[in-house]
C-alpha cells in the first residue's frame, strides 16, 4: 500500500500545480484583452502620422531628409529586438531569435557589422550569450508601458544613425495575428519609404503657417519611429499573453490527463493490494482448517 500512498501524494501535487496553471491562464487571458485594446488604440496614430510624413516630404522634395534617403554603401546596420521579460510563453522568444538571426546572417555573409538595442530581459540574456554588440537594454516595462519607456532606446539607435555609425535600422518583433498565431518578423525602420500612393495622388490636407514644415518633418520622423517601436512593444505584449494563455491551457489539460492516468494506476495498485490481502486471509483460514 506504500505505492498507493506515493501515487496519492503525486496526484495531490499535480492538482496544486493544475490550480496554478489554471489561474495563470485566466490572468493571461485578461491581460491579453487589455493589450489588444491598447494595440488597437495606437494603430491609427501610427497610420496617420505616416501619411502626414508623406505629405510633408513630398512638399519639400528638394530637401532630402537623411531618414528618407537610402545610403549606397551599407557598412553597418542596427537592430531593435523586442522580446519579453518573463518566460512561460511557449516558443515565442525562441522563434523570434531564429528569425532575427536568420536575417542577421545575410549581413554577416557580406561582412557587414551589426549593433543591437534589446527590449526585454529574455532578449538581453540571449544576445549576451550569442555575442551580439548590445548598445542598450530596456526591461521591466510591465504590462502597460508608456511611450516614454522606449524613447531612450530609440534615441540610442537614432544617434548612431545620425552619426552614420549605422546605415539602416531594423526591428525584430512578433506580429499578433490571432490568439493562436503569433508571427515573428523583421522589418526596416530606417531609411523610411514615403507612401507613394499618397504622393502620386497629389492631394494635400494641410497648410503650414508659418512654413516650418522642414522642422515639422524632422519632429514627425522621430515621433514616427518612436510610435513604431511602441506599437511593436504593445503588440509583442499581446503576443506574450496570448502565448502564455495557450501554454498554461495546455499545461492545465496535460495535468488533468496525468491525474487521470495516475488515478488509474492508483486504482489498479489498490485493487491488487486488496486482492493480495484477501488471498492471504483465505490462505490463513485454509491453514487453520
UniProtKB/Swiss-Prot annotation:
GO terms for cellular component: plasma membrane; proton-transporting ATP synthase complex. PROSITE patterns: ATPASE_GAMMA. The keyword Endoplasmic reticulum does not apply. SUPFAM superfamilies: ATP synthase (F1-ATPase), gamma subunit (SSF52943). GO terms for molecular function: ATP binding; proton-transporting ATP synthase activity, rotational mechanism. It comes from the Bacteria. Belongs to the ATPase gamma chain family. This is ATP synthase gamma chain.
